[in-house]
């Protein structure tokens, strides 16, 4: 029996009764993912970069300020995934959403960049706590259509990724940073309310154990997952790709300003990237279930690397929008397949740990990209810096292409 809702493994969970109706937990998860990402992404790009510049942060530090939420994820996602396996998915999701509902209001207190850094570290706890639990629950309930379901859930999250920058830039252009922070906080509170009707977790499996025993079990489970070379290889590929994603999130807004693109248009550029991803992820996930994960990963990563090289060689709203749409298509090809491949590789009952390890390694790349890019941009400029980041992505792609031909990856 399933620990969360008492269902047989692989069957969809029973729909809870909400306000006299029947609402699927999968729909609730997708709505939570949308609202959570909408709140979160409002303050990631372009607002964080522009706000950091407004309060006097140097160029090299802006990458750190954007990446700091991701740095939190590096250290928190790994144990949070394992804790979800032990204590329940819903509990971990609620903890993360409490942070998501409160963190945006703290931005109102920021006047200097070191305080902004502290707030960003705290804000990073939100996704670090709930994201592995949400992905693990989807992967666990739908093993026969894992990539398709994860693609649909990813599309729901990416609806928030699409609208977040657009809404954030629009509110910023209309009424300033303070109102944008408040709007983000209100949306975060709505995400918390949505997750409340989900079926309650069973009593934690570890309540009868001491803290030391629980910790020892977590370490053993995580060590088993980290020790799987196939999981490490897939995570490395996703991490390297997200070094490019993080670079764009941190420095594309600043580059766009140098080529006379307005704040509102910057939001639309990021929105275009998200629309491409949202529209294509479910189809990419379904196709990967049929054809195989590996071709989609290789093709998508290659496309993203080429686009990353090209972006700083163009100027104007329409060229930047076009290249960002292509970048969104590339990530849509990759992420449903990498996440599903992780699900293919793990043992039953270890989905949370696996997604936590995957998320932590993914976040390492997501954080390192902007940090390296900031130094390179200050030293060499946008064109050379973006080309260097793309070169690292291509190197990782070659490693993945050669290493993923083993039997442990199966037919997919």
Segments (PLM) and residue ranges:
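Residue-level signature of mid-helix packing/kink "hotspots" within the transmembrane helices
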Residues: 70-78, 161-162, 274-278, 282, ...
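Cytoplasmic helix-loop-helix junction between adjacent transmembrane helices
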Residues: 119-158, 340-341
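Structural signature of the two symmetry-related core transmembrane helices
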Residues: 91-105, 185, 295-309
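Helix-to-loop junctions at the C-terminal end of transmembrane segments
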Residues: 76-88, 281-292, 377
């Amino acid at each position: 029996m399933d620990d969360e809702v008492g269902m047989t493994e692989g069957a969809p969970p029973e729909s809870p009764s909400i306000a006299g109706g029947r609402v699927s937990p999968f729909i609730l998860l997708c709505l939570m993912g949308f609202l959570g990402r909408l709140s979160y992404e409002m303050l990631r790009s372009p607002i964080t970069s522009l706000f950091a510049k407004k309060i006097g942060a140097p160029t090299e530090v802006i990458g750190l300020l954007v990446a700091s939420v991701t740095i939190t994820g590096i250290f928190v996602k790994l144990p949070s995934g394992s804790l979800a396996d032990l204590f329940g998915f819903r509990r971990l999701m609620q903890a993360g959403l409490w942070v998501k509902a409160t963190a945006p209001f703290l931005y109102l207190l920021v006047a200097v960049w070191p305080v902004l850094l502290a707030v960003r570290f705290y804000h990073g706890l939100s996704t670090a706590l709930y994201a592995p639990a949400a992905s693990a629950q989807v992967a666990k309930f739908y093993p026969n259509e894992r990539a398709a379901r994860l693609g649909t859930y990813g599309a729901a999250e990416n609806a928030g990724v699409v609208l977040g920058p657009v809404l954030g830039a629009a509110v910023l252009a209309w009424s300033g940073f303070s109102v944008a922070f408040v709007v983000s906080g209100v949306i975060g509170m709505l995400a918390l309310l949505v997750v409340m009707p989900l079926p309650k977790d069973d009593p934690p499996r570890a309540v009868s154990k001491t803290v030391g025993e629980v910790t020892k079990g977590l370490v053993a489970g995580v060590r088993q997952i980290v020790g799987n070379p196939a999981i490490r290889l897939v995570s490395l590929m996703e991490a390297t790709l997200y070094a490019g994603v993080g670079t764009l999130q941190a420095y594309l807004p600043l580059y766009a300003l140098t080529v006379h693109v307005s704040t509102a248009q910057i939001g639309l550029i990021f929105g275009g990237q998200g629309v491409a991803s949202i529209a294509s992820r479910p189809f990419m996930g379904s196709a990967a279930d049929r054809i195989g994960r590996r071709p989609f990963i290789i093709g998508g990563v290659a496309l993203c690397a080429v686009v990353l090289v090209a972006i700083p060689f163009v100027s104007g709203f329409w060229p930047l929008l076009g290249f960002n749409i292509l970048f969104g298509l590339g990530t849509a090809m990759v992420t449903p397949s990498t996440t599903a491949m992780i699900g293919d590789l793990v043992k039953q009952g270890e989905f949370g740990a696996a997604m936590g390890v995957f998320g932590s390694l993914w976040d390492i790349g997501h954080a390192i990209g902007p940090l390296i890019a900031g130094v390179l941009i200050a030293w060499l400029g946008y064109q050379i810096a973006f080309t260097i980041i793309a070169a690292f992505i291509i190197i990782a792609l070659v490693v993945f292409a050669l290493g993923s031909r083993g039997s442990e990856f199966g037919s997919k």
